[in-house]
Amino acid sequence: MGRELLRAALDQAEINRLITRYWRVSVVELTSTTQGDLVQLVRDGKANAGDVIVAEYQSAGRGRLDRSFEAPKSTALLFSFYIEPKRNRDDWGWIPLIAGYSVAQSLHAFHAKIKWPNDILAEQKKIGGILIENSIKSSTEILSIIGIGI
């Protein structure tokens, strides 16, 4: 995949048309961080499970331990999504593993691997990361916001 393919603008209407059954996607030109935006929407009660925010550019992307993550405009896939897994509390620890496995499988053509706990590697080089924030909604419910930057 050439870099020119990554420069095409994201088409929010087309994305929603293709996946509208499960997800509601919002594409933004610029944000400080998709993760922060979605966390705030959840806190304000303005987000639903299945909401996704995709950005053309993040000015203050972040990783674990508040490390920064930055990529030039339209050169990276930057998104966060909100889920409410309907699983037993004992299963909540699997969320990061499932997210990492899913990313690696999606990028299998590039021989992607996950380096614990959240780095995405291809040819032994870091090409992205995964950031997961969980909040306990009740004794049996969890909210998860999963951010991915590639």
Where do the language-model regions lie?
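Acidic (Asp/Glu) carboxylate-rich active-site/surface patches
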Residues: 99-139, 149
